[in-house]
UniProtKB/Swiss-Prot annotation:
Gene name tied to this protein: dnaK
Name of the protein described by the UniProt record: Chaperone protein DnaK
GO MF annotation terms: ATP binding; ATP-dependent protein folding chaperone; unfolded protein binding
Induction data: By stress conditions e.g. heat shock.
Keywords assigned by UniProt, alphabetized: ATP-binding, Chaperone, Nucleotide-binding, Phosphoprotein, Stress response
Function: Acts as a chaperone.
Modified residues (Phosphothreonine): 173
Length: 609
């Protein structure tokens, strides 16, 4: 089996890792960073991903950030006359990470383990798998982020039994998972969370504060100005990060707006205590799922051996303090919160390929699954925090005499009424033979695979007629849509490659023109007028070609000029060699000339005596 990469597809940042020997290694992107912003931008038909896309977000309205928050929904982004689904945009980020891994490995990568928040529902998980497929990746496994973090933390601690609480506060989602580690088995006991809570929300409270203060002082509402909002977002994110290390930071945004008397500047000092006051309700919101996870696992805080913090937002001192206060234990600081999830995904990839042995991962389904029954109630078949993969069956009957069909309304959630839970899908079992109500026996079976994706079957036990459905939420893509998007992604990748090649060719041609001009000037009298004229003509021809759009013409003219410069250089070397040879010959002839000399014998003084 070829290399399987581990990917943390994050809301604000993503990361890719590979197993080297027994150790997971985070792969740096071309900019040298270990994480890549989950940002996609479109400009003049070109797609940009990562840091380069994030840098121009202020001036480019066609920039998409935090798309992960819309996974599993029918949300679409309209850009330059085309609609993009969250799956397509996420695929562009995955393609970028895939390319980073391929450049590092020097080989094609087509398999991956991708992480998702533990609290992602079926539709969100399916959307993530679809994104992988569009990016040209076979998703070997969808793994929960806190579980991946625990894998990375506990790989070298398999000898000891530990109960670990993973507190994962990322850019857009929040999860708490409790795992039991021992003898190479990583068993998830419970999970809880909030898919709409993360670092973006902490940024937002700062943005709201800045907007409010600026309005008080200048009477201008910056929230109505898109460009100003983007600048505020960048400043808020930076201030949040600064306040993890210092107690006060200065937010300075000159020319943020204009008033009657000219340009307006935003200049505000933000203290850590003020930020903590603004974010207090968000921090409190993280505590409820933490308590729920402990309750579901049947554990008290004193039974937790270790607390692992995951996600960039856990760097906020107030978050760390809240966790410490709630659990009564200092959080473990030995893992990098931005990278540990991707590293865990790489370890799971190693388990799949057989490179990591004696490790067993037992994950759970985060939400209860069931169907709607009479009275609009939800009847639960699989309780939340059930270990997966799993299967559960239950027999139901008809509600009316001679009922010819039954509607199976598949639900996910914890509320007693069907309407309060999430609809995963609906299907019908038809052709039920006429019979009094309560007589037909309809067996409904729920199957959840290792990725947490649900398959439901309904079977008439009297006729053995069967109908099944792999849950497709309203946002799920059909095979045809995925195939089209895969093709689009491949074409875009090819177009991007061609654009890069064109830029490289033009740069090389520009450099060659400069080189020729310099060479001709340096050689001066050492080349003939004819050679000089030929070089000038070929150089001018290439310059003219560079002004046009014909790539083949640029390539041809570049090759012609390269040939001329090579011939010129060869001639110069030849001339230099001849001159050197001639000099040596002249020196040799001088050395071989022998002159006669007169010698006179001089006797010693003693001989004179």
């Amino acid at each position: 089996m070829g290399k399987v990469i581990g990917i943390d597809l994050g809301t604000t940042n993503s990361c890719v890792s590979i197993l080297e020997g027994d150790e997971p290694k985070v792969i740096q992107n071309p900019e040298g960073a270990r994480t890549t912003p989950s940002v996609v931008a479109f400009k003049n038909g070109e797609t940009q991903v990562g840091e380069v896309a994030k840098r121009q977000a202020i001036t480019n309205p066609n920039t998409v950030q935090s798309i992960k928050r819309h996974m599993g929904t029918d949300y679409k982004v309209d850009i330059e006359g085309k609609s993009y689904t969250p799956q397509e945009l996420s695929a562009m980020i995955l393609q970028n990470l895939k390319s980073t891994a391929e450049n590092y490995l020097g080989d094609t990568v087509d398999k991956a383990v991708i992480t998702v928040p533990a609290y992602f529902n079926d539709g969100e998980r399916q959307a993530t798998k679809d994104a992988g497929k569009i990016a040209g990746l076979e998703v070997e496994r969808i793994i929960n982020e806190p579980t991946a973090a625990a894998l990375a933390y506990g790989l070298d601690k398999t000898e000891t039994d530990q109960k670990v609480l993973v507190f994962d506060l990322g850019g857009g989602t929040f999860d708490v998972s409790i795992l039991e580690l021992g003898d190479g088995v990583f068993e998830v006991l419970s999970t809880a969370g909030d898919n709409k809570l993360g670092g973006d929300d902490f940024d937002q409270v700062i943005i709201d504060y800045l907007v409010s203060e600026f309005k008080k002082e200048n009477g201008v509402d910056l929230s109505q100005d898109k460009m100003a909002l983007q600048r505020l977002k960048d400043a808020a994110e930076k201030a949040k990060k600064d306040l993890s290390g210092v107690s006060q930071t200065q937010i300075s945004l000159p020319f943020i707006s204009a008033g009657e008397n000219g340009p307006l500047h935003l200049e505000i000092s933000l203290t850590r205590s003020k930020f903590e006051e603004l974010a207090d309700s968000l921090i409190k919101k993280t505590m409820e799922p933490t308590r729920q996870a402990l309750k579901d696992a049947g554990l008290s805080t004193s039974e937790i051996d270790e607390v692992i913090l995951v996600g960039g937002s856990t760097r906020i001192p107030a978050v760390q303090e809240a966790v410490k206060k709630e659990i009564g234990k200092e959080p473990h600081k030995g893992v990098n919160p931005d990278e540990v999830v991707a590293m865990g995904a790489a370890i799971q990839a190693g388990v799949i390929t057989g490179d990591v042995k004696d490790v067993v991962l037992l994950d759970v389904t985060p939400l209860s699954l069931g169907i709607e029954i009479m009275g609009g109630r939800m009847n639960t078949l699989i309780e939340r925090n059930t270990t997966i993969p799993t299967s559960k069956s239950q027999v139901y009957s008809t509600a009316a005499d001679n009922q010819p069909a039954v509607d199976i309304h598949v639900l996910q959630g914890e509320r007693p009424m069907a309407s309060d839970n999430k609809t995963l899908g609906r299907f019908q079992l038809t052709d039920i033979p006429p019979a009094p109500r309560g007589v037909p026996q309809i067996e409904v079976t729920f199957d959840i695979d290792k990725n947490g994706i649900v398959n439901v079957t309904a079977k008439d036990l009297g006729t053995n007629k069967e109908q099944n459905i792999t849950i497709q939420s309203s946002s799920s893509l059909s095979d045809e849509e995925i195939d089209r998007m895969v093709k689009d992604a491949e074409e875009n990748a090819e177009a991007d490659k061609k654009r890069r090649e064109e830029v490289d060719l033009r740069n090389e041609a520009d450099s060659l023109v400069f080189q020729v001009e310099k060479t001709v000037k340096d050689l001066g009298e050492n080349i003939s007028d004819e050679d000089k004229k030929n070089a000038e003509e070929k150089k001018d021809a290439l310059k003219t070609a560079l002004e046009g759009e014909d790539i083949d013409d640029i390539k041809a003219k570049k090759e012609e000029l390269e040939k001329v410069i090579q011939e010129l250089s060869a001639k110069v070397y030849e001339q230099a060699q001849q001159a050197q040879q001639q000099a040596q010959e002249e020196q040799g002839s001088q050395d071989s000339t022998v002159e006669d000399a007169d010698f006179k014998e001089v006797k010693d003084d003693e001989d004179k005596k």
